[in-house]
Amino acid sequence: MNKYILKNGIILDGSENMKPYKADIFVNNGIIEDIITNGKSPSECSEIDLDGKYIMPGLINMHVHLAGNGKPQKKQRDNEKLVKKVFATPIGRFAATKLVENYAKIELMSGVTTIRTVGGLRDLDTKTRDKINKGLLDGPRII
């Protein structure tokens, strides 16, 4: 599906004083090439009916710790000691890697397409970013 039309969507463009409007979006090789408001979509494309669902630009989260889920901790813990224990075994390192990769994917599935990490578990943020950039993992752009 190289070329397709997202039909019957409601656009939220993120501009100041934005007003939602109905439009079709023409996508070619994964890149949005046109937003069509006159109903005249190219005919050589497959169509995906959005049935009035909203479309908006990806969100940006500028303060992310991929090793955490973002929920408040019930009690204070010694994170340095915990990290040493986790990284002491192969299964612990594997679990930590999968945790970080999963939280990156959760960000993406929540509409966040770019994140800035501000501290994580050793080099797992960087390794996760590299896997995403190579197409080995689904996730947001990590800066």
Question: What are the language-model segments listed below?
Answer:
Residues 1-42, 53-55:
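N-terminal metal-binding scaffold of metallo-dependent hydrolase/deaminase domains
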Residues 54-131:
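Metal-associated gating/positioning segment near the N- to mid-region
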Residues 133-143:
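Metal-coordinating catalytic core of metallo-dependent amide/deamination hydrolases
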Residues 14, 50, 62-64:
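Generic detector of well-ordered alpha-helical packing
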Residues 41-44, 65:
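A short local loop/turn or secondary-structure capping micro-motif enriched for an aromatic residue
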Residues 45-49:
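Short, well-ordered secondary-structure micro-motifs within conserved domains or adaptor modules
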Residues 13, 130-133:
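C-terminal cap/linker of serine protease catalytic domains
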